[in-house]
Amino acid sequence: MAERRRHKKRIQEVGEPSKEEKAVAKYLRFNCPTKSTNMMGHRVDYFIASKAVDCLLDSKWAKAKKGEEALFTTRESVVDYCNRLLKKQFFHRALKVMKMKYDKDIKKEKDKGKAESGKEEDKKSKKENIKDEKTKKEKEKKKDGEKEESKKEETPGTPKKKETKKKFKLEPHDDQVFLDGNEVYVWIYDPVHFKTFVMGLILVIAVIAATLFPLWPAEMRVGVYYLSVGAGCFVASILLLAVARCILFLIIWLITGGRHHFWFLPNLTADVGFIDSFRPLYTHEYKGPKADLKKDEKSETKKQQKSDSEEKSDSEKKEDEEGKVGPGNHGTEGSGGERHSDTDSDRREDDRSQHSSGNGNDFEMITKEELEQQTDGDCEEDEEEENDGETPKSSHEKS
């Protein structure tokens, strides 16, 4: 009872808020950026003090009117005015408390750390020999991972990695003062927005009009009937699309053994806007082993190399054909004489090598014998030529 009396006395001392204060608080409530979180089991909206000060400095009360001074000229004047709003319980100060892990989880982590430290000491000696192999494998994995990430980024509709945010909770602060900075303040004042008021009024009018459907004219009834049928067909088509895309995914998944994940209209049932639910048209993800990816890449590189080699071979063939047309038969005529000369020179070199294998005296004796044989051979050849010459002469005389 005593606390209630004190609270009533404080309210009487502070007084009720004026129209100007309500207008400023309403403007701040709907224009200052806010966030929602849980506090003491309730869902609340909170804002940051520095953003509230910036918002009020950009408002109409920061500009001087004719014959009147501006309400907000500096940041200090805004802070003083917000202190008045805080005392009149438009909002109150809160304290951010980061969520800590439970003691059981901490003990489990400590026990795991001790067990892992003992195992690591035993494995250190083995790891030193395997470090070189691991470094090579890691480099290859990094390259493959970069390629996969680049491919995923190029494909539209792929979900991006979510950044992990630290969780916190709000608690009421003991010192209820407005300070310009990163302080957190929770809204108590929650007026009805003009848009919500208009939407509620339209909804009430629509319900009353629906109850008066028998009194509508015939043209309006037919029009509403066709509109309702069209809306029902549209909803049914979306449901059929959702079922068909699941069936298509299952068929591709079964045929490829779970390696290819193909989704048609992936955002159709997602919590997005109407237009965003139909974009992108499809998404494709490959979740098979990396060996298949490497094989595909190797096959592509081989195909490229084959195509390059075929192009080179075609160009070389053309050059050879052009070279063959120019020289003609001149090369064939000179080739026969060169072959004969090469065989004679080879024979002479073989004879010289055989003769040089013996001593010096043997070489002299062999040369003399060869000279005698050569002279005898020359004489015999001369006699044969003379005999050949005489035979045609005798034939001519007989004729």
UniProtKB/Swiss-Prot annotation:
GO terms under cellular component: endoplasmic reticulum; endoplasmic reticulum membrane; membrane; rough endoplasmic reticulum
Modified residues annotated as Phosphothreonine in this record: 158, 375
Residue numbers on the Lumenal membrane side: 218-234
Predominant localisation class: endoplasmic reticulum
UniProt feature coiled coil, ranges: none
Name of one Pfam family that matches: Sec62
UniProt membrane topology term: Multi-pass membrane protein
Record-annotated membrane-spanning stretches: 197-217, 235-255
Biased composition range(s): Acidic residues: 372-389
Cytoplasmic side: 1-196, 256-399
Record bears the keyword Protein transport: yes
Record-level GO BP terms: cotranslational protein targeting to membrane; post-translational protein targeting to endoplasmic reticulum membrane; post-translational protein targeting to membrane, translocation
Compartments (UniProt record): Endoplasmic reticulum membrane
Region (Disordered): 108-167, 289-399
Bias kind Gly residues: ranges: 325-335
Keywords from the UniProt entry: Endoplasmic reticulum, Membrane, Phosphoprotein, Protein transport, Translocation, Transmembrane, Transmembrane helix, Transport
Skewed-composition ranges (Basic and acidic residues): 108-155, 289-324, 336-354, 390-399
Quaternary context: The ER translocon complex that consists of channel-forming core components SEC61A1, SEC61B and SEC61G and different auxiliary components such as SEC62 and SEC63. Interacts with SEC61B.
PANTHER family xref list: TRANSLOCATION PROTEIN SEC62
Functional description taken from the UniProt entry: Mediates post-translational transport of precursor polypeptides across endoplasmic reticulum (ER). Proposed to act as a targeting receptor for small presecretory proteins containing short and apolar signal peptides. Targets and properly positions newly synthesized presecretory proteins into the SEC61 channel-forming translocon complex, triggering channel opening for polypeptide translocation to the ER lumen.
Recorded family membership: Belongs to the SEC62 family.
Name recorded for this polypeptide: Translocation protein SEC62
Organism: Homo sapiens (Human)
Taxonomic lineage: Eukaryota, Metazoa, Chordata, Craniata, Vertebrata
Gene name, Swiss-Prot/TrEMBL: SEC62
